[in-house]
Amino acid sequence: MVLGVVGISYREAALKEREAAINILKDFEANTLFSQRFFGGEGSFVLLLTCHRAEIYYFSKSNHNVQSELLSRISALGARPYCYQGLACFTHLFTVTSGMDSLISGETEIQGQVKRAYIKAKTDRELPFALHFLFQKALKEGKDFRSQVSLSHPVVTIESVVEQTLDLHGKSTKDKLLFIGYSDINRKVANGLSAKGYRNLIFCSRKNISIPYATVARSQLSFREPYDVIFFGSSESAKDFPGLSLENLASISNRVIFDFNVPRTFTLMERPKDIVCLDMDFISEQVQKKLQISKQCTNKEKPFLALAARKQWEVYEKKCSHISSSQLQTSRPKLLIL
């Protein structure tokens, strides 16, 4: 039996390679028969896909070559994936869920992303005990970690990078800002800019929800409207926006566009002259530069997570041993007393 993870993050791969890895991993969701053959009977997987990481957590009873095959597929993209099994897999997911492996150490969004990835997987397909246990305990320990360990407010945030970038491009608090998608990252950036005096914030979402900002209906969305800054932060691609084209985006000169999506909403073959397009690679580079300057240290909390992971791993091993013994007993033929 093999319980493990294979993946890449912003450390091992640029945005282009992460996008390609996401497409490869999504094939397991798109092709049920293929994934069943790949992981074998009673095997399954959970995909954790975020702006900064693409990971597949898997369990397989029969295919002991799963790890090497996954590594080969992702390595073919030119990336250098990491892999962990058993206790190391537990420790990795616990560290990820706590936010201590994030680009911005201690950020809280990852807890929700891990939870949504787990819920999606168990809704879409049957998961084995191993994956249920791994994710449930990671979510529990991640929550406990935040309640027990005092983390200082991040020195660098995505909001601060966005604000500084807008300043560099001559944007003011009077400019008109459009947020496409009511996602975590869009809300966080909007809240940060609002606190800095930006008031002309407009959201466009597929969902009909009540929010503390002005809104524009999707049917009325036009990229020729005088939006000075546009933030793409939904899970949609370019084909979901009928009016999305380079011509329309460039219809407002000096427009700044942030594409927070991975894979990107759109890719440009050449750099446009009249607009500025920035993606998550840009955000990552800026954050890492600022972190190097601030010399933020976060390693001191990791032993806490390693200890929690070992404790839950030992519980998992005991439960697996008990399950195996029970299955063995039920599979033995009963002796007839003559």
Curated annotation (Swiss-Prot):
Coiled coil: none annotated. The keyword Transmembrane helix does not apply. InterPro entries: 4pyrrol_synth_GluRdtase (IPR000343), 4pyrrol_synth_GluRdtase_N (IPR015895), GluRdtase_CS (IPR018214), GluRdtase_N_sf (IPR036343). Pfam families: GlutR_N (PF05201). SUPFAM superfamilies: Glutamyl tRNA-reductase catalytic, N-terminal domain (SSF69742). Gene3D superfamilies: Glutamyl-tRNA reductase, N-terminal domain (3.30.460.30). It is an enzyme of class 1 (oxidoreductase). It comes from the Bacteria. NADP(+) binds at residues 181-186. Substrate binds at residues 50-53, 102, 107-109, 113. Keywords: NADP, Oxidoreductase, Porphyrin biosynthesis. GO terms for biological process: protoporphyrinogen IX biosynthetic process. GO terms for molecular function: glutamyl-tRNA reductase activity; NADP binding. It catalyses: (S)-4-amino-5-oxopentanoate + tRNA(Glu) + NADP(+) = L-glutamyl-tRNA(Glu) + NADPH + H(+). PROSITE patterns: GLUTR. The active site is at residue 51. Homodimer. During catalysis, the active site Cys acts as a nucleophile attacking the alpha-carbonyl group of tRNA-bound glutamate with the formation of a thioester intermediate between enzyme and glutamate, and the concomitant release of tRNA(Glu). The thioester intermediate is finally reduced by direct hydride transfer from NADPH, to form the product GSA. Belongs to the glutamyl-tRNA reductase family. Catalyzes the NADPH-dependent reduction of glutamyl-tRNA(Glu) to glutamate 1-semialdehyde (GSA). This is Glutamyl-tRNA reductase. The lineage of its organism: Bacteria, Pseudomonadati, Chlamydiota, Chlamydiia, Chlamydiales.
